[in-house]
């Protein structure tokens, strides 16, 4: 229960960091009420990279939320220590959610940051499964920072890759609906592999694939460019804007 409650904190922190960027986005609709349709978004490779980055980093996050404590129990930790390690990892996502937007804003593009965060989150989680027991606590710190940074960066990229608020709204919908459907497969596959192998070591291959794919999607989504989507000005929308 504590882990589930703590998971809401990074989201609030990321929203606080993301809101000023969204409010400064060019072409913000009058009063923020009317979002116009856009054309070409689902045909744009950059938009799909943002979507995949959102979904893949979420898959890693769901694996942490759902399976980190059982993974640690499998390593021989008792329930209390496994819960404390998991809580530490999730708590550190708060700091990462606050600091990542600052770091990302200072970068010419966010490709390198995306790769570093994906590597930190993935390798630390794999290390907690395969590495020595004494390394579990420091690896939990690294994992939390990497995972929280990925979440904040995924939200930031929606705004940074959008030319205006209309495109940002549709890109957000695309990234979060399609992305979260993809994300749901992560914990499910971890469970299937555990049932098949009888331990979590078999899941490290899946985690490695998720990490590499997250880094590749982040490298593509992090380049300094805008998605190619055109706002469609319909008569009804124009009348609504005028009102």
What residue spans do the PLM features occupy?
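Helix-to-loop junctions at the C-terminal end of transmembrane segments
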Residues: 96-109
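Structural signature of the two symmetry-related core transmembrane helices
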Residues: 112-126
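A late C-terminal transmembrane helix in Major Facilitator Superfamily
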Residues: 162-201, 206-207, 218
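Intracellular juxtamembrane helix-capping segments at the cytosolic ends
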Residues: 149-163
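Juxtamembrane intracellular "pre-TM" segments in multi-pass secondary transporters
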Residues: 21-50, 239
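Extracytoplasmic gate region of multi-pass secondary transporters
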Residues: 44-97
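Helix-loop-helix hairpin linking two adjacent transmembrane segments in secondary transporters
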Residues: 1-23
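Intrinsic disorder in cytosolic terminal tails and internal cytosolic loops
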Residues: 28-33, 160, 220-243
């Amino acid at each position: 229960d504590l882990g589930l409650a703590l998971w809401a904190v990074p989201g609030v922190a990321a929203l606080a960091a993301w809101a000023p960027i969204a409010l400064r986005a060019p072409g913000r609709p009058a009063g923020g009420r009317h979002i116009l349709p856009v054309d070409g978004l689902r045909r744009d490779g950059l938009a799909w990279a943002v979507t995949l980055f959102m979904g893949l980093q979420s898959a890693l996050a769901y694996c942490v939320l759902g399976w980190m404590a059982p993974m640690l129990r499998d390593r021989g930790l008792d329930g209390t220590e496994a819960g404390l390690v998991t809580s530490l990892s999730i708590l550190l996502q708060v700091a990462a959610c606050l600091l990542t937007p600052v770091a990302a804003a200072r970068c010419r593009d966010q490709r390198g940051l995306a790769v570093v965060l994906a590597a930190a989150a993935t390798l630390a989680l794999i290390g907690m499964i395969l590495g020595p027991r004494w390394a579990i606590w420091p690896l939990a710190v690294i994992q939390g920072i990497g995972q929280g940074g990925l979440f904040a960066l995924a939200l930031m990229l929606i705004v940074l890759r959008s030319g205006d608020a209309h495109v940002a709204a549709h890109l957000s919908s695309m990234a979060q609906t399609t992305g979260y459907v993809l994300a749901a497969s992560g914990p499910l596959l971890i469970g299937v592999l555990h049932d098949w192998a009888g331990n979590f070591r078999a899941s490290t291959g899946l985690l490695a694939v998720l990490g590499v794919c997250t880094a590749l999607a982040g490298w593509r989504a992090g380049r300094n460019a805008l998605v190619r989507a055109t706002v469609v000005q319909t008569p009804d929308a124009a009348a609504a804007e005028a009102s």
